[in-house]
């Protein structure tokens, strides 16, 4: 292919235009989204995933740590099996041994644990295609993590500033346990109110009346009422 191209142009002298962005790093997802309006669109979560690939987190060898790790590995295995993709650098055995994931993978994994615990809002999600499912899980995971760590949803690019919290012993277990607890409280509160009558329907709950961000706002209200996150632990 390169030899054919060289018959028509000199690749050594080819001028390739580029745009240099000198602003804050946390604004890159918005900048990229604006530049990419005419092409194949990537969500801001896909942009953040690429941007955060080097922000590593070591998960504890605990029930919650292992659940997060399984979600990350399972996601990649499904992408390989369902889309016939090759994922650069993915080695399931190596991940099991190191217990290392990155910040973006944490957000996805906690998002999937949350939607599984919140059937009243996202019970229909697992009947949808992989792309739609991943989009919703990303929204839930990234925004919930931002809420828990005191980062404005409009400034998700600042989440890496909180990485030092994840290196504090016991923090990840405490964070995951308390996040899931609040979502289970919300699930119990809305379960009877949104339950559809009859047993014949495949849908258990009337989910159309509550948008994703509305459900996330319920979590934000409870979280800020019950918890304060600092560099040492989560205070209740």
Could you say what each language-model-derived stretch is?
Residues 1-123, 206-209, 218-220, 231:
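Basic- and aromatic-enriched surface patches that contact anionic nucleotides/nucleic acids
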Residues 3, 67-81, 97, 131, ...:
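Polar/charged alpha-helical tracts
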Residues 10-12, 62, 102, 129-132, ...:
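Serine/threonine-rich low-complexity intrinsically disordered regions
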Residues 30, 138-142, 213, 217:
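Amphipathic alpha-helical interaction segments
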Residues 119-160:
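C-terminal solvent-exposed extensions
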Residues 146, 150-207, 214, 223:
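Structured, charged N-terminal subsegments at the starts of enzyme catalytic cores
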Residues 220-226:
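Short glycine/serine- and small hydrophobic-enriched flexible loop segments
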Residues 234-236:
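Conserved small/polar residues in nucleotide/adenosyl-binding loops
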């Amino acid at each position: 292919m390169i030899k054919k191209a060289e018959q028509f142009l000199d690749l050594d002298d080819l001028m390739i235009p580029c745009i240099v962005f000198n602003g804050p790093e946390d604004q890159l997802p918005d900048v990229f989204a604006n530049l990419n309006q005419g092409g194949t669109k990537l969500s801001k979560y896909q942009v953040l995933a690429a941007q955060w690939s080097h922000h590593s987190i070591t998960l504890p060898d605990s029930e919650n740590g292992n659940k997060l790790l399984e979600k990350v590995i399972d996601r990649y295995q499904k992408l390989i099996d369902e889309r016939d993709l090759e994922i650069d650098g993915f080695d399931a055995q190596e991940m099991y041994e190191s217990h290392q994931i990155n910040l973006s993978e944490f957000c996805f994994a906690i998002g999937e644990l949350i939607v599984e615990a919140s059937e009243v809002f996202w019970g229909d999600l697992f009947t949808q295609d992989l792309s739609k499912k991943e989009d919703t899980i990303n929204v839930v995971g990234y925004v919930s993590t931002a809420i828990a760590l005191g980062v404005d949803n409009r400034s998700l690019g600042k989440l890496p500033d909180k990485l030092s919290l994840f290196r504090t012993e016991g923090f990840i277990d405490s964070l995951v346990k308390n996040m899931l607890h609040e979502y289970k409280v919300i699930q119990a509160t809305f379960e009877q109110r949104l339950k559809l009558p009859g047993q014949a329907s495949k849908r258990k709950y009337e989910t159309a009346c509550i948008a994703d961000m509305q459900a996330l706002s319920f979590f934000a209200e409870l979280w800020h009422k019950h918890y304060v996150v600092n560099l040492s632990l989560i205070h209740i």
